[in-house]
Amino acid sequence: CLVGSEMCIRDSPCALTIGTYGVARRREDKKLRFYSMNFEQLGVIESSVEGLKPEKEADWTNYPKGVMWAFGEKGMEVTNGMDLLLFGNIPNGSGLSSSASVEVLTGYILRDQYGFEVSNQELALIGQFSENKFNGVNCGIMDQFAIAMGKKDHAIFLDTATMEFEYAPIQLEGAKLVISCSNKKRGLGDSKYNERRSECEAALAELQQVIGIESLGDLSEEQFETYKSAIKDPVRVKRARHAVYENQRTIKAVAALKANDITEFGKLMNASHVSLRDDYEVTGIELDTLVEEAWKIDGVIGSR
C-alpha cells in the first residue's frame, strides 16, 4: 500500500509484478491434493471437498480450502476434488499479501473450472470472506482487492466503505518504487490488526455520541480536532487520529498522482510513516530503521 492502511476508509494500494502461480487439474472424485514448491518439505497435503474445515496440520492449504468453502457459502458449490500445484515469488510473512494472493488465485481457478459467473471484484470479496470466516483472521479487503483489480502503472483509490474505486496513474519518469524487506516475520494472526481495529471502533462509538458519523473516514482533520475530547482514552485518541489523518492523506495522494506531483506524494508517504510510528504504533525498530536510513539518502522522494 503506497498510502493508507487497513483501518482507513480509503486506501491507495498498487499491484506488483510478483505473485502466485498455479497449475490445477479437476478430479472426478472428492479428493483435494495440494503441493507447494515453496514448502517442498511438507510434501503433498491431502483433504476433501466434503466437510471443509480449517485444520492446523493443513498448514497453508487452509487458504485455498477456505476459498472453496466460501464459494459454497455464496451458492457456488465446489463438487469435485482438485490437484493443485502452487509456486510463489512473494516473500512469505513480508507484508506483501502472499496469503491473499493464494486466495485470489484459487478463486480464478474455480471460476475457470466451473464457469462460475463472478467478477474479479467479487473474487476479492470472496477471498476476504474466506479469511475472515474460515481462517478466523479479521483482515480487511485491501490486499485481495489490489491483487484482483490491479492495473499496470496505476494505483487504486479504494473506498472500503462503499467499495467504489478509481485508478490513479503512477508516472515515475526518473524515479522507481523500491520495496525493502525488513526480514521481520509476521502474519495477520499475530499482528496488531485486531487490537487496532477494536481501538478504532471504540473511538468511533465515542465520537458518535457527539457527531453524526458512520466511520472515522467521515471526519476531516478539523472536525477531529474539534470533537476528539469525546474520546476518553488517550491511546484511542492516537489511533483515531491516525485513521482520520491517513484517510485525508490518501485523498491528497491521489490528487498528487493525478497531477504527476511525485514530490508531494513523497511528502505524504513520509507523513504516513510518522503517523504509523507515533499514533498507530505498528512499525517497530526494523521498519523505522529502514525508513529513517532511506530519508538520509539523496534522491529518496519518500519512504514508509
Locations of regions flagged by a protein language model:
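Gly/Ser-rich oxyanion-binding loop with an adjacent helix/lid
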Residues: 5-6, 10-14, 23, 41-50, ...
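Conserved short S/T/G-enriched processing/targeting/catalytic segments and their helical context
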Residues: 17
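C-terminal nucleotide
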Residues: 6, 11, 21-62, 72, ...
